[in-house]
Amino acid sequence: MRYNEKELQALSRQPAEMAAELGMRGPKKGSVAKRRLVKLVVNFLFYFRPDEAEPLGALLLERCRVAQEEPGGFSISFVEDLSRKYHFECCSQEQCQDWMEALQRASYEYMRQSLIFYRNEIRKMTGKDPLEQFGISEEARFQLNSLPKDGRTTCIGSQLNVLD
């Protein structure tokens, strides 16, 4: 995917849903964990040097997996290349759990699946389609049959490193 660098930098300045200094290690073999300011903004995970305002890079959180690593750590790997894995070290297991949950909720796919679930629950309770009033109830992206075959909701990301 191609992104406008200025737009990404502007997005990185928006209020973060979560932000913290974490240890971060990239996917290259032999890479060492470095302290990075990590900010979750919508479905992008930006990372910065702690003393700089411009991001070093960003990860687009679509079609990726978040996994628990050693205690107090987690990783993000991408479906199209599972060997490309970013490792993060938190101050506590609680902080690690908070980050993992927030990252899993950040993807468009997770939000879409949640919308479909609640749409069907409302339809069962009221007998009415809540999206009908907006004229979008027949769009494919809002249909249950457009969900992945395995029904998994843990797949959340794709990568983006354009701000180097």
Curated annotation (Swiss-Prot):
Chain ranges of the PH domain: 15-108
Top-level taxon of the source organism: Eukaryota
Organism from which the protein derives: Mus musculus (Mouse)
Protein name: Pleckstrin homology domain-containing family J member 1
PROSITE patterns reported for this sequence: PH_DOMAIN
Pfam families recorded: PH
